[in-house]
Amino acid sequence: MAPRVGCFLLAVLISASCKVVTSSDPMCTEKEANKTYNCENLGLREIPDTLPNTTEFLEFGFNFLPAIQNITFSRLINLIFLDLTRCQINWVHEDTFQNHHQLNTIVLTGNPLIFMAETSLTGPKLLKHLFLTQTGISSLEFIPVHNLENLESLHLGSNCISSINLPENFPTRNLKVLDFQNNAIHYISSKDINALEQATNLSLNFNGNDIKGIEPGAFNSKIFQSLKFGGSLNLSVILKGLQNSTIQSLWLGTFEDTDDQDLTSATFEGLCDMAVESINLQKHHFDGFSPSTFRCFTGLQELDLTAAHLKGLPSGIEGMNSLKKLVLNANSFDQLCQINAASFPSLTDLYVKGNRKKLDLGARCLEKLENLQKLDLSHSDIEASDCCNLQLKNLPHLQYLNLSYNEPLGLEDQAFKECPWLELLDLAFTHLRVKASQSPFQNLHLLRVLNLSHCLLDTSNRHLLEGLLDLRHLNVQGNHFQDGSISKTNLFQTVSSLEILILSSCDLLSIDQQAFHGLGKMSHLDLSHNSLTGDSMDALSPLKGIYLNLAANNIRIIPFHLLPTLSQQSTINLSHNPLDCTCSNIHFITWYKENLHKLEGSEETVCANPPPLRGVKLSDVKLSCGMTGMGIFFLVVFVFLLIILLIFSVKFLLRWKYQHI
């Protein structure tokens, strides 16, 4: 009985008082101290006084500024980037930016502009990017040309522009991007294009304009970085109009809501009279698909046929020896051999991602592509009981292989023997059935990145990763370990070169203290979304200077002796843990406040206990863990009772001895 009473009294003695320190958040969100701020959608009618004069990047969209003038932003003379999207601006007055010499980007997207003064853009010495998208402009004469000599990109999409005839003396010498997408442009004249002749390597965007005619010779001898005519109904008109031009990238794809014509061999005749490196024909339909369709494609280096409703490429295609990149995503091949890869012997990049049918890898379908370096077969319902040497035969230079999001794959010993130069292998969300006791990856000595997330791995196989001598990045997210624990002897012991290890969502309950020994090169460890407690941090003691993510675990209390382990890390995330904000955790809370510069996710690092502090940020909590006045009173009473008890005990003992003499 006496011990119980003593414990009760001691519990009362060591009582704690809790205090929450709150701070009012600034109206604008600070992204980088004294430089970058977001003031979007706050109903502001002026620049708030809380914004420092040193602000350089300001996102001020979705507020209310019907007119802007030279006093609107006069205080913020260091502005470099200004976003005024959808601020209901109607008027841009004279010299609005006259004191903003460093300003290089102005975003006026979504403002119903009525008037822009001729000198409204004067002031910035290096204005490079101007966004006038969705501003109701119907003529390019509306744009003030003064002080646009250094302009590199002009965005005029989603307006009512019907002619691209630029104003006289419009400076184009430094122009790199001119965006006219989703306007009402139907005809392009030689005069329109000649006005752009000073611009070199220009990117022109006409997506969403139904171009019905191009004046013959308009693009003659012109050189472009890229041209986009997406959504045009008649590609023959486009290609004939581009004769004798040189284009690095030509985008001729269409969209879901566009009712375009089927493409035939005749459609591409104009392509024979121009020099193009890359063409995109996504979502088109082909009529009479045959080798002759590709007659004018011989100079291409890149071809994108995404979602082109293809069931196969015709055999016998000739002259495409220059093609380096082929994109066949979202088509309907039954077998990989149906792409007739032998027609493209110089391919280095091949994408057959998101095939709409179950794709059979076949055997030796790609063996003629001995120069292939990058292969993406993800999201294609691929299933193979014995992968992958026969399927990837004669691909000795392959460096990147993506087989993620497929059906179960059976991996034999040295499953990637045909691809010894692999540097990145992605098998995420593909159930792997490792048949051999040895590693299926053991010949991949150059592999640097391996994604095995959600692969239903047998993590008890300590040999699984053997042979990966240069592995830097390993993702095993979503796999499970026996009894929810990483033991002393585990599959990571054979990959001492690891720098990044992802172990999130693995249902981990504990980690052995020796689990990460030998991983001295580690710089990033993600243990988030598990069920680890504070005691599991003993396993982290060998790791120093790492990014450590412990978010969304079951950490309540972090013992005092583990704080040095946390202190030796560079960045730590402890958000979304049920942290105890009582005196039993006082050492950690004190450490936390002293190391805020190391902590990530502090807004979501909150108390779970006691109930009065639930949801309060850890950095806002103050604990007084000394004795209160009530505690002192009980201490005096306890000591007094203890003395009386001691006196009576001594007196009783002496009387007992006296009676037994």
Language-model regions: role of each:
Residues 2-661:
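Extracellular leucine-rich repeat
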